Amino acid sequence: MQGLRWVQLSDAERDEFLGDGGTGVLSFATTGDEPPVSIPVSYGYFADADTIYFRLSVPDDSRKKSLVDNPISFVVHRETEAGWRSVVATGRLEAVDDAPYESAALQGLWAVDIPTVDVFERPPSEIPYRTYRLRPDDLTGRKEVDSKP
């Protein structure tokens, strides 16, 4: 890619890029020689606490049930008017469905907007969901800049 170089997003640029919710790709670590399990998901982002929330479908036959305790990475990327942007977060998911109402975990959830994307052949009311949060061990963003003279 001639003429392009990457630089880090500032925290403010990262927060603006993530907004209060959108879509990205969540990847779960696996064992042995298996590739990571990657799924497109909706997310909500609470910038005040650098916390990302997910509402994941977990039907009985879901492989996610056996993977949610594994390390994860989460990626959001898209082209903006100012060029390409991406954010990568890593860490472990924490279930928040059973957290007390007054807990920081649930209070942060009320501040985000997790988009509803219907990708199933059944009505959403028939699908079990669990809510998780990610307080990233690492949260970085990059942006494209024009390096032409």
Region locations from a protein language model:
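Short beta-strand segments
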Residues: 21-59, 74-75
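Extreme N-terminal tail/first-helix region
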Residues: 1-20
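Surface-exposed connector loops and short turns at secondary-structure junctions
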Residues: 63-67
